[in-house]
């Protein structure tokens, strides 16, 4: 099963986000950003799916508190989550953020986890904006092609 599908299936079943991280650990090669890129693209797809645009943006204020309440980030963790959230929005907007340049200073191998947290928050926010259950948003997003990567 692909990283994208595993994340969407887990969200659709309302699996705890930390259990999702544990499920996805085997797909993450050490010292690599994968599957973070997959999760950022999924987050961008969620923005597209719910109709977020320059004319009708999805507010980021309170995103973590409203749509990822099970995660409490502190200090650098907040900055890492913020970067993943903004990188996903940048991808949705048509730019390609320089992930390697950014995550090198993190000095830890956890970018993919923050990308996962951002994707979870965006999928939940997109479902809320569309007025549908998260399960429905996940099913709709699963039908989109995404990437063929694992």
Language model segments and positions:
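Solvent-exposed interaction surfaces and binding hotspots enriched for charged
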Residues: 1-150
